[in-house]
């Protein structure tokens, strides 16, 4: 429903408490900062992610995906929708004829299987992704090779943050 009344005090903060059951917001200052490599979790050779929100109650994760060398990332299938926004560099899927360049928004529909490639002339790619559900890694014939979901992402974060001295609990700030 559109707003039908005029707010006479638009710069006055809401005066009532938030619901007791509401979880706190997440604010990640300077999320694109390259100043601390410990914040980037290794996922594969030359592939890293920076967690922003790991939602265990709804089964999705939001992260920055960084690739520091050209090449094939992975072939995978999504049973749920994925949203992406390219912040740096570019990439494409072998199965499609478009290229996601810096500033591009990408919607991947449920059921999509694709092979992500960073072109040879790209030194670094960073994309903001929201992945809902799970990613199934497959071979060219669709044979299951592995999977990732919000819980495997959390475990990867715990191990990495412990190893680099931030402590396994560092990941808790991103979990909702």
Map each language-model feature to its residues.
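Beta-strand-enriched cores of mature, soluble protein domains
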Residues: 63, 69, 80, 106-107, ...
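Short histidine-centered beta-strand/loop micro-motifs
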Residues: 63-65, 73-78, 95-98, 117-119
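Short, conserved beta-strand element in jelly-roll/cupin
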Residues: 66-68, 76-93, 130-132
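Short acidic-glycine-tyrosine-enriched beta hairpin
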Residues: 91-115
